[in-house]
Amino acid sequence: MTADDGVPIYYTDRGEGDPIFLIHGWTMNHKFFQHNIPELSRTHRVVTMDIRGHGRSGKQELNMSLRQAAKDARAVIEHLSLDRVTIAGWSMGTSLIFHYFDLFGGERLKGAVFIDMTPRLVNDGGWEHGVFGTLDYAAAYALERDIFEDRLTVEEALIPACFKDGEAPDEETVEWWIGESMLTPTGVMAAFWTSMVAHDWREQLPRTPVPVLLCYGARSALYPTELGALLDERIPQSELVVFEESGHSPFWEEPEKFNREIARFAG
């Protein structure tokens, strides 16, 4: 599929039934849902999309923002004539969903799934639920600089943080994750980091237009605070499911439980 600005957008479409639309995280791609698509597609129609600049989508570095990515997601939904979609976003994928709500409300959606993500990445005196519970604007800008100066070192630090207690399960998994992540151009990585840092969606939470399933890891290194419980309080139609043996990636760390919960929620 081609987006409205000419950038090719890669998607997959498998199974039949009520649609589930899986959106990956920062620098990742649809392959990260390899433990979920086969099982979920037994009972649902499962769609994935590689966000522009990621995976097999176009790398033109044109309009590399989450707002445009949300428009791309809407275009995929329209292209496939989907309705009553359960849209699930992991990490940055949840940020994309916030932009979707801002642009389109709950149009074409039945529900949403937030997977271990914050409405505001940066911490300050009044907010401790951002990245690591400590990342401030100075650190956010420093990370953008480091992405350009020594990207591999950044990847080697961030990838283990995606697992429980900040410890990757094995070297082979880390190598695969880094290899797939490095397919995203460095300029794209930096652009989407800036796009995430620039937005604060806390005020939108009480106006969330659809029911939300909150999937949060009890042992998340990226979000070590009680973020899931906080969002459960602020989002009117929400349900919190805590993954006791997961960090930032419950769909990978506890796939059977994740698949069961998201299938139940999607109906």
Kindly give the residue locations of the regions a language model identified.
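Active-site loop/oxyanion-hole signature of alpha/beta-hydrolase fold enzymes
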Residues: 34-38, 47-92, 101-103, 260
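Alpha/beta-hydrolase active-site loop signature
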Residues: 27, 51-55, 94, 119, ...
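Flexible "cap/lid" loop of the alpha/beta hydrolase fold
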Residues: 98-103, 108-146
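Alpha/beta-hydrolase fold catalytic core
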Residues: 1-21, 42-45, 82-83, 110, ...
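Conserved HGGG/HGGXW glycine-rich cap/lid loop of the alpha/beta-hydrolase fold
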Residues: 7-62
